[in-house]
Amino acid sequence: MGNYSRRRFLQGSLAIVAGNVLPCAAMAADNPPLWIPPLTSVGRGSPILLNARNVKKAFDNNKVDAWGFNGSYLGPTIKMKQNDFLRLTYRNNLSEAIAINIQGLQANGEVSGSINRNLAPNSSWSPIIQIKQSASTCWYHSDTIGRSAYQSYRGLIGMWIIEDEESKKNLLPNKYGENDIPLILQDISLNYDGQQVFNLEKNSFLGKQLFVNGQRNPFINVARGFIRLRLLNASVSRPYYLHLDNQQPFFKIASGLGFLPQPLEQKVLLLAPGERAEILVNTNQNKPLRLLAGDSANIIDKVRGWLGMSDHLQNNLVVELRPQGLASAFAQQKPTLPDAKLGLPLSPQKERHIHLSTQDAMINQRRFDPRRIDIFAQLNSVERWVLTADQATGFQLQGAKFLIEQQNGERNKKEMLAWTDTVWVEGETRILVQFDNPSSNSYPFIFGASNLLLADKGCMGLLVVQ
């Protein structure tokens, strides 16, 4: 075989990729309709089964093996009301042990699940969970020690919505799948057979393609007016910078665990891994709106990605919103929100410094040890945690909630505050943590990197609240 230079190879590859990529833009009409995870609304005391098992899923054109709950890739969306309770049965029909965490659930450590409740194959666990918290958008996913990233990536993911009476009284869109739309973002790499590919060797994983509710480049027909999007970054490591293609602003109305004091108009939304947010998008127009995740890869980036040399996404469309019907007068008015229940001012009783080492997968120079409690906090207290990291990464906390007090030396204004459990740490980040739920040495909470692969490598710790 003659001498074949790298430059000639790249030039040939560019021609191939250009031939494959350019027609796709002209085939936007072939984009799939957005799949909406089935809704399970829970009444008072109702039982729910989450059955983890093997499923078939077509990421590309071929159906391949994946994981999921109740027979589908990704689990059902569970909706509950404040002050309701349910009997939740986790069933493991997979060939390896799993543990499931409901991230954002404000409950005691004994019923929270997570690493404290490891389910062997063909076993089950049935906690009774009471919902005390205000309106929230939570999510459930694998939290198995050393395997949470891989198992979540395979499909052990679902959204969990909590409503309260005050939020129902407001005129916010609340028709699930119509004007209140769940969007679960994942970056996934596929092989030539359309099967998921995952690399466990590094401390982070960046997939090549963006999937939303298990689909690439989906669209949804929506009524004109305000549309509520519940956004969940379910990617292992990748953050997302979300914006509309026409640079139109939208209103952020909530973080994962509560509403903002008032709608916050912005053009870009950053979502850390594991973070949730709610936004309102005005679709009172004649043209489709495209929600995008950063910039799309150009042809060179696509080639580099094909060669394993680029971390750019090959596609960046989250969803295309296609307005239908008559214009809505309501969309001309700025929406109002329920009480954010911030309880300000918060007076911290203690300050802690927490450093995430993204290179060595440690917190404060210590790697995770399931036999060691790293932090003891007092029940019903408030603490200030000062977060830093070697490189920008996500941080999350279980069983408690916090307000983001300061980021990169800038203090957040009151109108930017909302309760959450996840934050992107770039530079110094100060959070005010409120401990409303008890845990114990036998059933501790966890905290640490929201990059699940980094957490699996040891960048997390155990928290006891008493």
Swiss-Prot record:
Predicted to be exported by the Tat system. The position of the signal peptide cleavage has not been experimentally proven. GO terms for cellular component: cell division site; outer membrane-bounded periplasmic space. It is found in: Periplasm. Keywords: Cell cycle, Cell division, Periplasm, Signal. Pfam families: Cu-oxidase_2, Cu-oxidase_3. One of its GO terms (molecular function) is oxidoreductase activity. Belongs to the FtsP family. This is Cell division protein FtsP. It comes from Gallibacterium anatis (strain UMN179) (Pasteurella anatis).
